Amino acid sequence: LIVPRVLGLGSTLHLGAVAVKLGMLNPDDVDDEILADAADHLGAAQLAAAVPIVLAAVATAGFGLRRHEAEQATGKSQTANLIVAVAMNAASAGLLVASTDRQTPAAQRVTMPSLAASLATITAGISAQYATRPKGQALVIAASALMLPVNLLFSYVPVRAALKRSQSSKKRR
């Protein structure tokens, strides 16, 4: 379940292993053909991933408008935090747009809406926290708790749909 990070130090959660442990997938379900089919049918996942990205953009705009109040509440400049929030929004949107590039490998394309939505979820939580209660942590904690289900859902649904299409086409033969 825990694997070393590709970049950087530490470990990360292997979502494929989580899906298997939860009984959502079997270890041998996913192959290159299934991933290619999932990548060809990402429209719904891409559209759904746009929702947290828009929410993150709205929360970041709210943070930008209330930055001076946050600075007064914390006694610290919030410029760097705002720049990071804007960069995270841009990265989320960039990942979502990149998921439409058919030159990108299918396995990578399938994970991009999931990663975009997860990044946007945490960005929305952090930005909303700074905009409303800069010294609090409740929204950041809630957004952090949402990241795993969002990531799992956006990764799982396209693959599961591709598996169902594959199974139904095999039955018709």
Where are these regions (language model features)?
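Short amphipathic, positively biased membrane-proximal segments
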Residues: L1-R173
